[in-house]
Amino acid sequence: MMISRACLSALAALTVPYPATADGDAPESRVVVAVAHPDDELFMAPAIAALAREGHRVTIVHATPGDAGPGVSDFPKGEALAAVRRGEALCSGTALGAAEVVNLGFGDGKLAGHVRDGSLAKALAPHVTGAATVLTWGPDGGYGHADHRLVSAITTQIVQARTAGERPALLYVGIAAGTLPPVAEMADWAVTDPALLTQTIAYTPADLAAAKAAALCHVTQFPEASRQGMMGLFDATMWRGKVHFHPAF
């Protein structure tokens, strides 16, 4: 996704009220962020930073290293790009305060081949075990990306099989209808009825700054103007001081 400099400049004057504290689970609970690619965590980045700041142990799990790109770098598809993106993921996770960043190593764009044999579920399930909360894409995958949808579906499959005493809260990140950033690149992103987005994680200016630092890590995926302005754009439009989630159950 690329965001034009003009759109970023147009939104620069917007101001956003920030809640004093972030909403989270009990201190020191485990939170797992299950997504498909390095950079997917950006769409809930200040929420991750808020949870980590409050003392939750956050693990970010990427199903693939993003070896297919395409991004904005000169790297061809393959292991060289994957290696750089793993480093970008670690940089981003560190900026957000995550305790652990894990890559499951499946091929970018090839997750469908690991659903029927159960290998994706088997690889992801141990990371979900013991978590109090799991954050992931909604069924829409943000903008319909097949890998995003599959990670959401497999994560849901894992969580719904757990008994009540072992089942973590499962939250789908969502964009409330009417709050999409006014950029052409996001015109086709899925939105959710605000009435369903009943869980929010509020963040502070420091958490947003951490999110901005995380975005700067993903050099292969976004031009500099987008990396510099993406979090501010999201803050001014679809977040406004808190990231919105739809409880799965």
Regions found by a protein language model. Name each.
Residues M1-R5:
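Positively charged n-region of N-terminal signal peptides that target proteins for export
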Residues A6-T15:
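Bacterial N-terminal signal peptides
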Residues C7, P70, H148:
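Functionally engaged cysteine thiol sites
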Residues T15, P65, G105, G138, ...:
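Residues that line or immediately flank small-molecule/substrate-binding pockets and catalytic motifs
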Residues Y18-A34, E54, V115-F249:
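Metal-dependent de-N-acetylase/amidase catalytic core
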Residues Y18-T129, T156-G165:
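Active-site rim/loop-helix segments in enzyme catalytic domains that contact anionic ligands
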